[in-house]
């Protein structure tokens, strides 16, 4: 049974999500058994990235009654002669588009969630479908974003990634203020109060109406309607405890990444969601011909020996893991004091959030040096992730268990 399930998603296709998910899962498998599950079922992206024979895939799980653990494909010895990635396996999507597998309903989705929860691995990485729909949202955690991937070269995907954050957080708030929630029973006149909360959430979500721009404005209106009420504190704490983790792909320097990817991402989050959330940059992957060539050969860059170096070289993550964990400890989100619920800013102000992200990006870049090897990038990303997995609560990074629809 997995200790942690981590989805990797993106607002749009073309940002290298599957490349990041595949190599991250491979790198993580050096430290603990890891299974990559291809939930981008319309394109079978993982199968296209790892060109090894697949005996059983999600088709056999849904149509032929195979258990999901029977659909795990391992690397052949010829691909991993030294057994460096013996802890890695993947579940491929179907070879061709099959409607009931690509657009599975609630019953099949619940069955798949249950099966993922029982996979024989410490870590399960989900390569999600690009974009945002029910077959994405239902596999995402409730209290954090999993890993979001975006790139300086596709601005529309950066903005769409912030929409994923909004969708997860609003789903969490609606669960908190639903009749089945424990909080519901603690509120005086719960039906009237939760109706008010959900009506105001509708206003924030409706981008076509010039109503409430974000959850901070939502708190202002809620305070005007309820006064000093425990609901305000519950909303504020739910937002504050939400964690956003992201990776920059096709990285080409701090200035470009910040101006064309990080800045619009943060500004959109602050203006349409809230400035109370905690953001964590897990690292980046440089733009690399090796990655492109590996994708063309259907052999991930971590499995392709670089020119002049053996494929079985010790990874930087293995040689320097303790040092990297000490290093990343100083790059975690600053322990800011809890914000008072009131007064709430009446106008979005992203500058403090932008300053924190730029400072973290600069410190990461200068501490790591100008490394242009994607292997080093994945080692670093993995070390950052392991640091979180060892220290953070399961609700802060990925999830311990999929709940399903």
Regions found by a protein language model. Name each.
Residues 101, 128, 132-139:
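Conserved ATPase-coupling elements of RecA-like P-loop NTPase cores
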Residues 2-41:
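Walker A/P-loop phosphate-binding motif and the immediately C-terminal alpha-helix
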Residues 37, 92-93, 148-151, 247-250:
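Conserved beta-strand segments of the P-loop GTPase G domain that flank and frequently precede/overlap
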Residues 182-405:
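C-terminal lobe/tail of nucleotide-utilizing enzymes
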Residues 39-118, 122, 191-199, 243-245, ...:
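P-loop/Walker-type NTP enzyme "switch/lid" segment
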Residues 116, 133, 158-174, 228:
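Conserved C-terminal guanine-recognition region of P-loop GTPase G domains, centered on the G4
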Residues 41-43, 95-98, 131-132, 153-156, ...:
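Conserved nucleotide-binding/hydrolysis micro-motifs of P-loop NTPases
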């Amino acid at each position: 049974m997995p200790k942690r399930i981590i989805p990797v998603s993106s607002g749009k296709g073309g940002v290298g999500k599957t490349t990041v998910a595949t190599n991250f899962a491979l790198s993580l498998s050096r430290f603990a058994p890891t299974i990559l599950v291809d939930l981008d079922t319309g394109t079978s992206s993982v199968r296209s990235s790892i060109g090894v024979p697949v005996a059983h895939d999600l088709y056999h799980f849904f149509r032929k009654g195979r258990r999901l653990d029977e659909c795990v494909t391992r690397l052949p010895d010829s691909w991993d002669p030294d057994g460096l990635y013996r802890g890695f396996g993947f579940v491929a999507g179907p070879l061709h588009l099959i409607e009931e597998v690509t657009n599975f309903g609630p019953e099949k989705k619940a069955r798949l969630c249950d099966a993922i929860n029982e996979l024989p691995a410490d870590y399960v990485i989900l390569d999600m479908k690009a974009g945002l729909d029910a077959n994405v949202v239902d596999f995402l955690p409730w209290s954090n974003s999993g890993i979001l991937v975006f790139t300086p070269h596709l601005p529309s995907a950066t903005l769409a990634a912030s929409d994923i954050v909004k969708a997860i957080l609003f789903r969490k708030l609606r669960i908190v203020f639903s009749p089945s929630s424990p909080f519901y029973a603690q509120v005086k006149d719960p039906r009237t109060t939760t109706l008010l909360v959900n009506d105001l959430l509708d206003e924030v979500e409706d981008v076509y109406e010039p109503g409430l721009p974000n959850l901070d404005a939502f708190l202002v209106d809620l305070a005007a309607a309820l006064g000093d009420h425990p609901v305000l504190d519950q909303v504020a704490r739910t937002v504050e405890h939400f964690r956003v983790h992201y990776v920059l792909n096709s990285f080409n320097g701090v200035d470009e990444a910040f101006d064309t990817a990080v800045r619009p991402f943060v500004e959109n989050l602050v203006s349409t969601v809230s400035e109370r959330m905690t953001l964590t940059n897990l690292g980046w992957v440089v733009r690399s011909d090796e990655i492109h060539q590996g994708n063309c050969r259907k052999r991930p860059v971590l499995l392709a020996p670089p020119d002049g170096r053996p494929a079985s070289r010790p990874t930087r993550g293995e040689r320097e893991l303790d040092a990297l964990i000490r290093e990343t400890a100083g790059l975690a989100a600053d322990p800011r004091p809890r914000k008072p619920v009131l007064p709430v800013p009446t106008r979005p102000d992203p500058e403090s959030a932008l300053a924190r992200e730029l400072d973290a990006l600069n410190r990461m870049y200068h501490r790591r040096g100008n490394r242009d090897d994607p292997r080093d990038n994945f080692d670093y990303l993995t070390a950052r992730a392991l640091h979180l997995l060892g220290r953070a609560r399961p609700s802060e990074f990925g999830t311990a268990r999929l709940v399903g629809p």
